[in-house]
Amino acid sequence: MTTTVPVKTKYEAIIGLETHCQLSTQTKIFSNSSTEFGATPNTNIDPICMGMPGVLPVLNEKVLEYAVKAGLALNCEIALYSKFDRKQYFYPDLPKNYQISQYDLPIAEHGWLEIEIVEEDGNATRKKIGITRLHMEEDAGKLVHGGSDRLSGSTYSMVDYNRAGVPLIEIVSEPDIRSGIEAAEYAQELRRIVRYLGVSDGNMQEGSLRCDVNVSVRPVGQKEFGTKVEIKNMNSFSAIQRAIEYEIERQTEAIETGEKIIQETRLWEEASQCTVSMRTKEGSSDYRYFPEPDIPPIEVSTQQLDTWKAELPELPAQKRYLYESKLGLSAYDTRVLTDDFNVAKYFEAAVAAGGNSKQVANWVMGDITAFLKNEKISINDITLKPDNLAELVTIIDDGTISGKIAKDILPELLSKGGSPKELVEKKGLIQISDIKAIEAIIDEVLAAHPEELAKYRGGKTKLKGFFVGQVMKKTQGRADPKMTNQLISKKLEG
């Protein structure tokens, strides 16, 4: 008897990402105009970025530094000698009708980064994704379409050249990615790295991080790649994942029905949750690259390389390894804590001040993160210092206060700061841990509720929670919960 192999197991996706990352320099790559986001259209421009006759571009050295640091963080080989090239194409947002980029001698090549896919059980699957190259280039302007939310229905277009000449690094991955979730995690890890380095804010909504995805599908076991399709217009990590999943499905169905896949560029439409054809894909020969005549070759000295390498911070992957191996945290916890550099810094400072690592992690990931989201602030804005959080964790652990009391006073600590221990003493919230004192309160509660006591002893054992609640009410939550539970059980059975 023959069986049909499910379509999804017959094919595999081959995926690569081209990620454009705006660098956080104060001025543009080849001129002194500001890179400020959100300025009035066409105010941050100058003769150089507009390509006026007779102007000469000069490389912003900070761009070179940031590009090299990004290359080092991605385990790339840094080119001590590289150059810029002109990429020729015609589009309204490109004032010079060419883009200054790097073609055959990029600043960095042959790197890799490791991604982690956290499973439902909290463990992580790790995979290395190769980096083909990293190169420097200038950004283009921005077209603003009017008359419709969609390009196809717009009745007019305007161009803002403020973005023209803003420095970019383009990071090209090897085709090592096999799913939408791997691609989304790769893009997120890139953002973590550039943010840790301080070379970019990685804000996708403002266009500081833009990903183009190349997807092809081939039968499992086939060595040759299928026809590649490029996808653009994804402004979130979830959109990257969904666009890839849709495109894999589309190409698989096309192959199954005998349809030919066309090499083209497609746009992801968020509203319809599908990709639509934009244009046929150009090859590098269509851009007529040639060396940029107005900018001399770039040379990186060994002294510069050593200096920039020494300035690299501890990166997300290094922190995750240390948190798991040294602090015993789960893959999920380490992922959450290292997603933001400042959160990781705060966590480490609290642990260094003596806080139990797991308890500190729980407070940072739970109540503190909820407070930050509610107040729309960052962890740098709270007045609860890391050593105060360590103190809070310690006085819970040593029985000075209960976890409930800690939750009650946390909002005040987050908004006003100060010593948790002093606040607890001032408010008279120190936990009651004296056995005789708690027994006396339990006796009062039982005497005041004879009906409930009779019902409990008649088989309604769930009423134990009622008695615990009454004790907590009388003590304003100060009775030691563990001791209270034990003593009530003993009294009820007596």
Curated annotation (Swiss-Prot):
InterPro entries: Asn/Gln-tRNA_amidoTrfase_suB/E, Asn/Gln-tRNA_Trfase_suB/E_cat, Asn/Gln_amidotransferase, Asn/Gln_tRNA_amidoTrase-B-like, GatB, GatB_C_1, GatB_Yqey_C_2, Gln-tRNA_amidoTrfase_suB_CS. Keywords: ATP-binding, Ligase, Nucleotide-binding, Protein biosynthesis. The keyword Disulfide bond does not apply. GO terms for biological process: glutaminyl-tRNAGln biosynthesis via transamidation; translation. It catalyses: L-glutamyl-tRNA(Gln) + L-glutamine + ATP + H2O = L-glutaminyl-tRNA(Gln) + L-glutamate + ADP + phosphate + H(+); L-aspartyl-tRNA(Asn) + L-glutamine + ATP + H2O = L-asparaginyl-tRNA(Asn) + L-glutamate + ADP + phosphate + 2 H(+). Pfam families: GatB_N (PF02934), GatB_Yqey (PF02637). Its EC number is 6.3.5.-. GO terms for molecular function: asparaginyl-tRNA synthase (glutamine-hydrolyzing) activity; ATP binding; glutaminyl-tRNA synthase (glutamine-hydrolyzing) activity. It is an enzyme of class 6 (ligase). Coiled coil: none annotated. It comes from the Bacteria. The keyword Nucleotide-binding applies. Belongs to the GatB/GatE family. GatB subfamily. Allows the formation of correctly charged Asn-tRNA(Asn) or Gln-tRNA(Gln) through the transamidation of misacylated Asp-tRNA(Asn) or Glu-tRNA(Gln) in organisms which lack either or both of asparaginyl-tRNA or glutaminyl-tRNA synthetases. The reaction takes place in the presence of glutamine and ATP through an activated phospho-Asp-tRNA(Asn) or phospho-Glu-tRNA(Gln). NCBIfam families: gatB (TIGR00133), PRK05477.1-2 (NF004012), PRK05477.1-4 (NF004014). PANTHER family: GLUTAMYL-TRNA GLN AMIDOTRANSFERASE SUBUNIT B MITOCHONDRIAL AND PROKARYOTIC PET112-RELATED, GLUTAMYL-TRNA(GLN) AMIDOTRANSFERASE SUBUNIT B, MITOCHONDRIAL. Heterotrimer of A, B and C subunits. HAMAP family: GatB. This is Aspartyl/glutamyl-tRNA(Asn/Gln) amidotransferase subunit B. It comes from Trichodesmium erythraeum (strain IMS101).
